[in-house]
Amino acid sequence: MAAGTHRMMVLVDTTVWIDFFSAKPEPHVNTFETLIADREDICICGVILTEILQGIRDNAEFSQTRKLLGNMIYLPMQVDDYVRSAQIYRHLRRKGITVRKSVDCMIAAVAMAHDVFLLHNDRDFLPIKKHFGLKAL
């Protein structure tokens, strides 16, 4: 990283982590690998942590993954973020847009509250980007 440049802070969605751990050759995985190589600030939030860990069956892999994710920058959710999440969901619903997983509204609310980019591979974030200015990669 060049002197005087700022690191990019990126909240990495569960969809990207899963494909990364599975070594899938997908564009979002390539972007994630570039962020890691460039030593950008990789962030996680509680919802993403839960989604990743709940899908792991093997105890050793669970412990290893928990340790790895514990090294990420943790973005906490405040009460206002939960309210914002509900507002996002309700606003899109009034426009006839159904977000399939309400946790995606929570993840978007965290990203927006902390003013970080969201790296994802989930179409639920597209209308949030369009209607709320979510900074998505």
Where are the language model's segments positioned?
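A generic structural signal for short hydrophobic patches within well-formed alpha-helices
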Residues: 17-18, 49-52, 125
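Generic structural signal for small/hydrophobic residues in well-ordered secondary structure
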Residues: 13-14, 52, 85, 111
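Short beta-strand scaffold positions
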Residues: 12, 44, 76, 119-120
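Conserved glycosyltransferase catalytic-site signature
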Residues: 14, 46, 103-105
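Short, well-structured N-terminal submotif of metal-dependent ribonuclease cores
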Residues: 1-44, 54-67
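Active-site neighborhoods of divalent-metal-dependent phosphate/nucleic-acid chemistry enzymes
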Residues: 2-6, 73-119
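A beta-strand edge to alpha-helix "cap/lid" segment located at domain peripheries
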Residues: 127-129, 135-136
